[in-house]
Design a protein with these regions (language model features):
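His/Asp/Glu-enriched, well-ordered alpha-helical/loop segment
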Residues: 307-317, 324-347, 352, 372-482, ...
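Phosphate/diphosphate-binding loops
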Residues: 239-260, 264, 346-352, 357, ...
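Flexible loop/turn segments at secondary-structure boundaries
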Residues: 113-115, 144-145, 216-217, 223-229, ...
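Divalent metal-binding segments
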Residues: 2-8, 13-240, 246-251, 275-308, ...
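Non-cysteine beta-strand/loop elements that form the S-adenosyl-L-methionine
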Residues: 68, 262-278, 368-378
Length: 509
């Protein structure tokens, strides 16, 4: 038997253990050999492709465990407002966009904390930039939408819906939160065609391959999103060159069963976000005394739902940010386990930003998986950033990666794209360089978050996630030996080649 592809002169990091090999061979879609020396010569014929890694690292393809695929793809077409620092800069970008199109001007990823005004622009501010075209702006975590006056009239959202901010005269300011924001977002997202979805996903995938992503956990549908997104992914899941694992973000077990899906949830909200001060805490927000966030479900409601997931043997993934939400989710899992005795479903908790040490220990005892987002630390950690503004001195308690791993819990990593950068090296860098030293993990542990642990979190550890004979040839070749660089340079690492199921889909070697 001859190999289709040989990667030689490499440092192949197996990830399932700490062994490093010099070469590997691929036939069809699988790894057929991995070893040291020059034994690969017997596997070469005239059609074998030989890739010389020149001493650089070779890793399994990355698995992003929390990725809003349709949302990210569609938002690539939007006006990126993440780094703007003033209303004036917003205006410059909107005016530039208005020259290109008379359709809705869609702004994404706006952070109030980055603005010198320290508040969101209202409709009157946006009207100065365009008064004859709808403007729709989302903040970074999608908890806030902003419309100009034309947009208010165009989208016809009833003014009596909860979450529509009113000025002193009782007129809408154009700023939508809560139910109003969710209604507006869902209405607009429902208007997208499947042709739009497909075209934009196909444009996005080469960018994912360029950073080494070969599998995404697609969090689609449900509150604040569109079920049309989830249905599109379900119907077209095999049409794209990377692996897509659908997490249908709904409460409808019948719908999930009809589709024969093995899991439910994703961003299935138990609470809100820190930015909007809706993440459910056991203490008051530092910058808003009296506010402790909110729970979406009562304990009784969540107990019933979680028990039903156990009974139906569905892997459940719950969105939990604040410690009070984490407590509620753990209570529900303990209730369901006691009622049913069913184990081994690898239920997940997403984000888990403020878990206490006792909560981490309880989660480990329950056999739960933490799906966390290290890049949050890059965006919001630090004494003058959003975590410290919202949490005060407790900002040092966020994202306990070290403690999670030490407890024995499986920890997988995701970007939460497009809230954060989907480049896995940014996530790995953030986990290794957590601003709070005691929460940091090693480079090897961080790589496992995006490879073998990500595979385990979707029951795929026997098929992918490590470089082993018989596993899928999901492989990336880096531009350097990642274990020989300074930890401060991890986010500078590039991918030279991405192989998915034995096919070279990105290559600059």
């Amino acid at each position: 038997m001859y190999a289709d592809i040989i990667i030689k002169n490499a440092k192949c990091i197996t990830v399932n253990n700490k062994k490093v090999f010099e070469w590997l061979a691929i036939k069809d879609e699988k790894i057929i050999a991995i070893d040291n020396g020059e034994k690969y010569n017997s596997l070469i014929n005239k059609t074998t492709i030989i890739l010389d890694a020149k001493g650089k690292s070779v890793l399994p393809g990355f698995i992003d465990s929390h990725f809003h695929l349709v949302q990210t793809a569609m938002n690539e077409e939007g006006v990126n407002l993440h780094n703007v620092s003033s209303f004036e800069e917003i205006g410059e970008k909107i005016k530039k966009a208005n020259l290109k199109s008379k359709e809705t001007i869609f702004g994404v990823r706006l952070e109030k904390e980055n603005l010198q005004e320290k508040k969101f622009p209202d409709r009157k501010v946006l009207d100065k930039f365009s008064d004859d075209t709808p403007i729709w702006i989302n903040n970074l975590d999608y908890q806030v939408s902003i419309l100009n006056t034309y947009g208010l009239l165009y989208y016809k959202i009833p003014f009596r819906i909860d979450g529509i901010e009113l000025d002193e005269k009782g007129a809408p300011t154009g700023i939508f939160t809560g139910k109003a924001n969710a209604t507006l977002r869902t209405n607009i997202l429902n208007s997208y065609s499947n042709k739009n979805r497909e075209e934009n996903i196909r444009k996005l995938i080469p960018k994912l391959l360029e950073v080494g992503i070969t599998t995404v956990n697609a969090m689609e549908g449900g509150y604040m999103y569109s079920d049309k997104d989830a249905n599109f992914i379900y119907e077209h899941i095999a049409d794209f060159p990377i692996d897509i694992v659908l997490f249908y973000q709904c409460l409808d077990l019948d719908k999930v069963r009809e589709k024969k899906l093995k899991r439910i949830g994703g961003s299935l909200y138990i609470d809100g976000t820190r930015g909007a001060r809706t993440a459910a805490l056991t203490f008051e927000y530092n910058d808003k005394p009296g506010e402790m966030g909110r729970l979406i479900f009562s304990q009784k409601e969540l107990n019933v739902f979680v028990e039903e997931c156990y009974i139906n043997k569905l892997q459940l993934s719950l969105y939990t940010i604040g410690d009070r939400a984490i407590e509620t989710a753990l209570n529900a899992h303990e209730y369901a386990l006691e009622k049913t005795g069913i184990k081994g479903l690898r239920h997940r908790m997403e984000h888990v930003e403020l878990a206490s040490l006792p909560q981490i220990k309880r989660a480990e005892k329950l056999g739960l998986i933490f799906s966390m987002n290290p890049t949050y630390e890059r965006y919001w950690e630090g004494s003058n950033k959003m975590y410290s503004e919202r949490l005060g001195k407790r900002y040092v308690e966020t994202n306990k990666f070290r403690e999670t791993i030490d407890s024995g819990l499986t920890l997988c990593g995701g970007s939460d794209s497009d809230v954060c950068d989907y480049n896995p090296f940014v996530g790995i860098h953030s986990a290794v360089n957590h601003p709070v030293k005691k929460h940091r993990i090693s480079l090897y542990e961080a790589i496992k978050m995006y490879t073998i642990n990500g595979a385990y979190a979707i029951f795929e550890e026997n098929n992918k996630g490590s470089l082993e004979i018989g596993k899928l040839a999901d492989i990336i070749i880096l531009d350097r030996d990642i274990f020989e660089i300074d930890t401060e340079s991890i986010d500078k690492v590039k991918v030279l080649c991405t192989i998915k199921s034995g096919k070279i889909l990105y290559n600059t070697i």
